[in-house]
Amino acid sequence: MGIMSKILGGGGSRTTEDYVELDLDDFDTARGDAGLSVHIAEIGGQQDVIAIKDAVYDGNLVIADITRHTTSDSTMEHIIDDLRQVAREVDGDIVQKGDDQIVITPTGISISRQKLNG
């Protein structure tokens, strides 16, 4: 898999090794308490939805990997319905990016349906 497909999300499953920890100590930044956190999650089954719901209710954004399921899978349809309901309840947003990711946002954050470069 080339670098561009990794950046743009082309195919293949992701692991925690695909995410690189960046050392911010080399940068002069003001590091206060963040009002929002971004969580990465994997959805293997219905039980994984609880932690995602809790994170969104707590005001955090979640990017969930759904590569273990097909989007036509009845379990996945039920999971997506549950997450849609959470997004509605908190006045957030939810989108599915390709066949491998779902992004769920908390109150006050919407997701543009248009690419920046396209």
From Swiss-Prot:
Assembly and interaction partners: Homodimer. Does not oligomerize. Interacts with FtsZ2.
Keyword Hydrolase assigned: no
Top-level taxon of origin: Archaea
Signal sequence interval, chain numbering: none
GO-annotated biological processes: cell division
Transmembrane segments: none
Name of the molecule in the record: Cell division protein SepF
InterPro entries: Cell_div_SepF/SepF-rel (IPR007561), SepF-like_sf (IPR038594), SepF_arc (IPR012426)
